[in-house]
């Protein structure tokens, strides 16, 4: 009887493990291959070789690009090199990327930038919020952009017990923001178990100097976050659930769910066209390939444009897609005046004219 019970328990455990493995592979779109969609007027941006994980463009056409992310389980082409913030002026005929100098007093050696967001104050001061992972921790660094000498002045480092595994931020004030925690754990082994078991413990946090609170929860992995042009709605990409959530923002900064748009790909960062309200997102057609270091089968790239997301049937257009021969692991796409920038987690960046 004891042997029968033991065999039954082993069988149940094996069945559960197999079911979790299948669900894990489905969340990563492990079998999907991408059909190419080409854009004719594109070139790789010189100088960006180790990632362009997030991009934010000011209304005047200046684009900030975070580069050099080292993230648990993912490839890095320069694991010992500190991260950087690049600047591009999209008003130029052939825009180039240049590294922004960071003021003294900031630990550049441990700089590991992830998601970014800009905020323009009433006096036209430009603030840059940068998710940072020094020594595999999570902070949000607040900088002031000095356009006259293309530099960043570090103002402060923001830490909090609710900011545990920050992926992206969207600024809503000169020192306040919404942030996504893409996992409950930050330790790589526990993070992997969280993903494998399909735990929905990821969340969104509102931060200000006066108040810090959880405002949304129940995500597999809350990733990119952004705000509508009218400031009424917050958009959140759940990368492992293949969808984008629309949340209504209230006067007390709480969020309530409005709708969810389901996709067939892993949407990473979200960018919003301030003129049209369209959402642009860099996506991973097959997330499993991100974790493999296979030069013969690299992670592919995909860019989606979402129009009228509040409508009953939004329009979703695949603007760009390719198998990784040009760009590996697209994480962001954003537009300005007919120009498209496409960034990646750890690879190159692409400039296109639409």
UniProtKB/Swiss-Prot annotation:
A single GO cellular-component term on record: membrane
GO molecular function: aryldialkylphosphatase activity; arylesterase activity; metal ion binding
EC number from the UniProt entry: 3.1.1.2, 3.1.8.1
Residues annotated as the enzyme's active site: 114
Binding-site residues, Ca(2+) 1: 53, 167, 223, 268-269
Sugar-modified residues: 29, 254, 269, 323
Ligand binding (Ca(2+) 2): 54, 116, 168
Subcellular localization: Membrane
Catalytic activity annotation: a phenyl acetate + H2O = a phenol + acetate + H(+); An aryl dialkyl phosphate + H2O = dialkyl phosphate + an aryl alcohol
Keywords annotated in UniProt: Calcium, Disulfide bond, Glycoprotein, Hydrolase, Membrane, Metal-binding, Signal
Family matches, as SUPFAM superfamilies: Calcium-dependent phosphotriesterase (SSF63829)
Record's keyword annotation contains Disulfide bond: yes
InterPro entries to which the protein is assigned, alphabetical: 6-blade_b-propeller_TolB-like, Arylesterase, Paraoxonase2, Serum_paraoxonase/arylesterase
SS bond list: 42-352
Family membership noted in the UniProt record: Belongs to the paraoxonase family.
Role summary: The absence of paraoxonase activity in turkey and chicken blood and in turkey liver indicates that PON2, if expressed, does not hydrolyze paraoxon.
Protein name: Serum paraoxonase/arylesterase 2
Organism: Gallus gallus
Gene name, Swiss-Prot/TrEMBL: PON2
